[in-house]
Amino acid sequence: MTGKTTKSTSDVPAEAAGAIRVPRLDQQLCFALYSASGLMTKLYRPLLDPLGLTYPQYLAMLALWEHAPSTVGALGEALGLDSATLTPLLKRMEAGGLITRRRDAADERRVLVEPTAKGQALRSRIKDVSLALACSVPLEPVEAKALHATLTHLVAGLRNAVTEDASADAEALVSGST
């Protein structure tokens, strides 16, 4: 040892060390979206518990009330879920008597999903859930509508980016330029 003290790079501010400045966690769009999503799910839980629904089941029922019967693939696409996530969800809903699943007579490879009478009966009670949630969200109706439009635009752009990335990855694999 020479007796000299040296500063480690961890003692030097990032800007002085020439490091790239990374935005703080609370400045990250992804974290704001992640936090908002988690909190919305928590707000829904006490509203959906009396109906015997989880938040993902609620979303599945909303999609099925709009388009039933639906193929498992179309439902997964509407919800943004892959079959490994969707199939167990549908099995629980079927066991609870909310939906039926059956093979498509026109194409045995396809499974059709639709609400049962019990599942349809929940529809009238969902309006109360929507109203209660609207009262819990700290946004004026016009703000909520604007946020919804912005998020819908964001989701469409992200889906496009994910699709383009997947296509580029597939092209690279086929051409051998990975």
Role assignments for model-derived ranges:
Residues 1-21, 139-178:
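C-terminal regulatory/oligomerization modules of transcriptional regulators
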Residues 31-34, 38-85, 163:
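N-terminal helix-turn-helix DNA-binding core of bacterial DNA-binding proteins
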Residues 37, 123, 155-158:
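A structural signal for well-ordered alpha-helices, especially hydrophobic packing surfaces
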Residues 41, 69, 91-149:
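Charged, amphipathic alpha-helical coiled-coil/dimerization segments
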